[in-house]
């Protein structure tokens, strides 16, 4: 009998083992859809981004008007731009839900998969940041100035690093050109890291909602989960197109409709909504270096998740106390997101400081203590 090409061809074999004949736990829920959704988001972003780059000019005098030109004169340019801008928001929604699921279900115990995932998150954040600077509006310019300036808090070498990153003594043309180069390059790095992430995942196999070894009961990925993923795509692309077509500027800052002006500072400098939680943590510490360290720690703390897992059970499915803490953490992040969008005045300052403290206390102290307590209660 002739060999099945799908199973014998060197390239098709890899695709087959990853997307067709992959043994998958039979009980994974819709929370396991977000990985494939992130893949679709990334593909959409790269395609729309490529089309935008064809019409974009990375020059301070032309950047703003080149985007206006794209929206007005290019066939469906407005749609491509709106899909790209709002696609970023959707990508972040998916990645935050994906990470939340990982924390809830103890997926971080696949250490290599988890660590590559956190590196992916950091790369994605860098990509989104440099991308936000490209339209060269007021918030683009001042956001770039404020965030890059944080590196000057590094003792001794900080100022040198900032001027090296800027390519001068302020955010100007060299900064814009290099940010465009980086924004073009990083998504391909993300794609490469995604393949590494998947390689590690397929090495150990997927986790599942019960957190038990599922080897005794696995089903092929196709047709079961491929169908389920297509449903996920539809349910995700629907809100994206709705947003891009009906209220494309809902999540943007009106300040960015004004071309960048180094002489006029906007009243409230704030990043896009998906960075507000980290921005709130940064602002809640009055000291510059302290704020920068807290900002870095707010994401890097994810690397510690595998070390802080003290429970004898993998998931939180049967741990009511940890569940309570988990949802408190979610509420806490929503509060931080809200605080990040507010001006620095009473009562927002104290709320932000309390929420920032609670964020770290829950992750670093309460989760391990509660796990140990639950072990005792269950006589483990």
Curated annotation (Swiss-Prot):
A ubiquinone binds at residue 202. Heme b b566 binds at residues 98, 197. It is a multi-pass membrane protein. GO terms for biological process: mitochondrial electron transport, ubiquinol to cytochrome c. The keyword Membrane applies. The chain crosses the membrane at residues 34-54, 78-99, 114-134, 179-199, 227-247, 289-309, 321-341, 348-368. The keyword Repressor does not apply. Keywords: Electron transport, Heme, Iron, Membrane, Metal-binding, Mitochondrion, Mitochondrion inner membrane, Respiratory chain, Transmembrane, Transmembrane helix, Transport, Ubiquinone. Binds 2 heme b groups non-covalently. It is found in: Mitochondrion inner membrane. InterPro entries: Cyt_b/b6_C, Cyt_b/b6_C_sf, Cyt_b/b6_N, Cytb/b6-like_sf, Cytochrome_b, Cytochrome_b_C_euk/bac, Cytochrome_b_N_euk/bac, Di-haem_cyt_TM. GO terms for cellular component: mitochondrial inner membrane; respiratory chain complex III. Its cofactor is heme b. It comes from the Eukaryota. GO terms for molecular function: metal ion binding; ubiquinol-cytochrome-c reductase activity. Heme b b562 binds at residues 84, 183. Belongs to the cytochrome b family. Component of the ubiquinol-cytochrome c reductase complex (complex III or cytochrome b-c1 complex) that is part of the mitochondrial respiratory chain. The b-c1 complex mediates electron transfer from ubiquinol to cytochrome c. Contributes to the generation of a proton gradient across the mitochondrial membrane that is then used for ATP synthesis. Heme 1 (or BL or b562) is low-potential and absorbs at about 562 nm, and heme 2 (or BH or b566) is high-potential and absorbs at about 566 nm. The cytochrome bc1 complex contains 11 subunits: 3 respiratory subunits (MT-CYB, CYC1 and UQCRFS1), 2 core proteins (UQCRC1 and UQCRC2) and 6 low-molecular weight proteins (UQCRH/QCR6, UQCRB/QCR7, UQCRQ/QCR8, UQCR10/QCR9, UQCR11/QCR10 and a cleavage product of UQCRFS1). This cytochrome bc1 complex then forms a dimer. This is Cytochrome b. It comes from Pygoscelis antarcticus (Chinstrap penguin). The gene is MT-CYB.
